[in-house]
Amino acid sequence: EFTCPLHPTKKRTAFMNEATDYAADMNLILAYQNLLDDWKDEKSYTKKAFVKILDKDYTRIMSKYPRQVAAVEAFMKKTEEVEKNNETNLDLVAGLTGEMLGEVLCWREDEWSDELRTLGFYMGKFIYLMDAYEDYEEDRKKKSYNPLIQMEKENEQEFNTFCRLLLTSMMSECARSFERLPILLHADILRNILYSGVWSRYE
């Protein structure tokens, strides 16, 4: 049991194991890299202070999961490059997120590694494309980088239809990989997320 900062009067129950510890470590890696990226872009000393706070944990995770940390670091570097070069190849750009998430979801090298990488790859591409679609109007106004802007210029009439088909295709591949995994606990909840929940931002 633990005390939630938002609801301090009531004890909460948490189930913790090696898998939840791994998820927490991966979240910290991503948070650390995002803070570092914000510090580079904004020169925010608040972000830099948070990076310093997380330094020790980041080093610990790096020694424990070098493959995953290397994948996230490579992703951040490549993403910076494609944005700087104003890359318009949507598949290439979205694939960077897919490759990174594939490595993060692949906790261990075992018989399910390839399937988890495939699941993460298509989930990552879906997430990138969904974010790009959601931010499209704002990015266009601010003239910020977004590979969908060039696509819309090339085929304005079919733009929304194409985006929907692309997102559906990514999630279909993701769902196929999910169904091949031996998931028994909370499978229905996860299916609900994959088949319905992920579309909430689009709709």
How would you label these PLM feature ranges?
Residues E1-T118, K125, L129-T168, R176-I189, ...:
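Acidic catalytic motifs of isoprenoid enzymes
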